Amino acid sequence: AERGFAKQACIGSSFSSKTGLFRGNLMGKRVDHCARTVITGAPELDIDEIGVPERIARTLTVPIPVTSFNRAAVQRLIAAGKVKQLVDDASGTIIPCAAGQTPKMLCPGFVAERFLQNGDVVVLNRQPTLHRCSIMAHRVRVVPGLTLQLHPSCTAPYNADFDGDEMNMHVPQT
């Protein structure tokens, strides 16, 4: 097999089989910065909100480029324990952050990886994604519990119900 493709008998089977181009190389790849869990109904949420469990919110991060304009705000986030790590864009060095710590060399060019917080925008989808409404953006509301919480009024586009359906949440990194 050359370049990651399985050896196929004919051109047609190289596209349609389980190890073919589409199913083997383009569909169903693992990605970072996402979560998958069961959904439950939460009518107290706004229709454009998704309830994200605290455990997931303390795992997934949003990159914040440090500039001369937001340097003080990023330092406050680090001191409050809301930043997982700093990444130096120039060297790629990763500096873990702890609550109460204030980095001495925080300067423009660093990227702070902040934990999810209320108001962040995430992309939610339920497979199979058959049409464009099966994947939509929602605002985060961090909630207690272990399941993603969704307003019952916005289940129709996802063809979802609350009988054990799982949904995927992706955190944009730009």
Give the location of each predicted region.
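Core mixed alpha/beta domains of very large multi-subunit molecular machines
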Residues: 1-174
